[in-house]
Swiss-Prot record:
Taxon lineage: Eukaryota, Metazoa, Chordata, Craniata, Vertebrata
Biological source species: Danio rerio (Zebrafish)
A Gene Ontology cellular-component term: membrane
Protein name stated in the entry: Cysteine and tyrosine-rich protein 1
Keyword check for Membrane: yes
Keywords: Membrane, Signal, Transmembrane, Transmembrane helix
Transmembrane annotation, as ranges: 63-83
Amino acid sequence: MENPRSASLQKSWKFVRESLLLCLIAGRGEAQCDGCIEYCCDGVPPFCCSYYAYVGDVLSGTAISGIVFGVVFLMGAVAAVFLCVCMCVKNSRGSRVGVFSSTYINTVTQGYPGPPPPPYSYDHEMFPPDLRPPPYTPTVPRSANYSPPPPYPGFSRK
């Protein structure tokens, strides 16, 4: 009686040999490049390949723009996380910059000390008053007292 383990091993080797033989026989035939003649790659035998394999190592514009968009997007995400972490750390302690003290913020929100500025007048304009344009006066639309243009010379309605 034959060992069941050796029988399964023989079946496995038979499958490998037949698969290898099939690959070798199929590999010797010519590739069908009828549908992809523009992208038929050189080789023995010639084979159909994708556009990017046909172009080679040169990246297309779409691929480059996708890479640039991805890098910029990741940089923005990293910057947002960095700002969030910085703001959270900053809120736990006082500000290191002196201009953000509470007295400065109160001064800005309540107005500067001292008298208010003078009211705005046209005396401070760049041009003197005599160079200003005249006031706007709407004009009445003109009536159409002209004849229509002549007909197009290349087309006749006869």
